[in-house]
Amino acid sequence: MDKIFVDEAVNELQTIQDMLRWSVSRFSAANIWYGHGTDNPWDEAVQLVLPSLYLPLDIPEDMRTARLTSSEKHRIVERVIRRVNERIPVAYLTNKAWFCGHEFYVDERVLVPRSPIGELINNKFAGLISKQPQHILDMCTGSGCIAIACAYAFPDAEVDAVDISPDALAVAEQNIEEHGLIHNVIPIRSDLFRDLPKVQYDLIVTNPPYVDAEDMSDLPNEYRHEPELGLASGTDGLKLTRRILGNAADYLADDGVLICEVGNSMVHLMEQYPDVPFTWLEFDNGGDGVFMLTKEQLIAAREHFAIYKD
């Protein structure tokens, strides 16, 4: 962005509303990619401008006319420039993201939270589980957002938050502490189930890496700032999912269920395993590629995934 253009913004824009409008204009003109918690330039601007001012997203309407200091304007303009020129997701610029109505710390060690599984958590998995879960596993926890949201939804449950990445677990631990859930959510480093004791979970929720090789090569630049370890999963996007399917039954209680997100790779899963009775879940707020299997169904399908058992 031209320096004269930037100086003009700092000198002439005065209020929060001015900065919101200017940010929307810049985002719209730059044709940036939305997909890290927002789907339009207005929401993108709100999530950049207000956290940059250490304000909540739901400030009163009349507060938007508040005037800004020069340093505040410079901070916002700098972040807008980086969002446009470097295609950095807003969450990495502000170190804030939201999931299930809760705020989380994020940086480039973890993916930005955006899973449709959040809708299931908000609905307490209604119609999917037969009882209140006492022991929940969040596999591939990343920032810990799913594990923490589950702990809020089921305050009497113990939640294990598993990831192979020590960097991701450091972020998850920070979020667990900030939410005051150190006695409810337990971070565990493990290569999927490989280093876990044989615990029986009532519910296993997982959003593993599932982007196939073709989609990885075509991802917008915004996704290049996210850890590849959290995205890529082999040629067809199912490298980790097969291992999960090969092992999950051993870690589920008799009436337990597995809920797994595979995104666009659902096509490959259905093509390769037509005999497996995946229940594909529907969402009111958008999203797809999430299936459910019961322990009984996983046991019945074992022959398909036996070679992937740890």
Swiss-Prot record:
GO terms for cellular component: cytosol. Transmembrane segments: none annotated. NCBIfam families: hemK_fam, L3_gln_methyl. Its EC number is 2.1.1.298. It is an enzyme of class 2 (transferase). Specifically methylates ribosomal protein uL3 on 'Gln-150'. Does not methylate the translation termination release factors RF1 or RF2. Belongs to the protein N5-glutamine methyltransferase family. PrmB subfamily. This is Ribosomal protein uL3 glutamine methyltransferase.
